[in-house]
């Protein structure tokens, strides 16, 4: 979990509304260069205006889900159109992803619970 603005292991705790992009992928067997590119994208996204945090999970079956939290839809669009990110997207389509979906959701409410230690 990338903690930038009140993000927790289970999501973002903070001022609503905000937006979430949900990137669900099924990987191919060709992962050459993937980790390096993913690390670079994480570095870049952390520097973006409006980026609030990220969480990811990956299964042994190649299914991966990454949720990024954003202040506005304009911030999401700016990231989508970042030149280095666009190049990485092309690489993903050409080499690493068998399939993917991107969903964008507005978060109007968060509810959480944590058992005291």
Listing of model-derived features with the role each one plays in the protein:
Residues 89-92, 96-98:
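Short arginine-rich
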Residues 66-70:
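Conserved RNP beta-strands of RNA recognition motif
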């Amino acid at each position: 979990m990338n903690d930038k603005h009140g993000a927790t292991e289970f999501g973002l705790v903070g001022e609503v509304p905000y937006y979430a992009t949900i990137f669900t992928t099924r990987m191919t067997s060709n992962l050459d260069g993937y980790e390096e590119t993913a690390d670079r994208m994480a570095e870049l996204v952390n520097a973006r205006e409006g980026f609030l945090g990220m969480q990811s999970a990956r299964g042994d079956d190649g299914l991966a889900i990454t949720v990024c939290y954003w202040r506005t839809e304009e911030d999401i669009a700016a990231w989508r159109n970042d030149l280095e990110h666009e190049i990485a997207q092309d690489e993903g389509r050409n080499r690493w992803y068998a399939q993917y979906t991107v969903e964008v959701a507005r978060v109007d409410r968060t509810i959480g619970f944590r058992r005291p230690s």
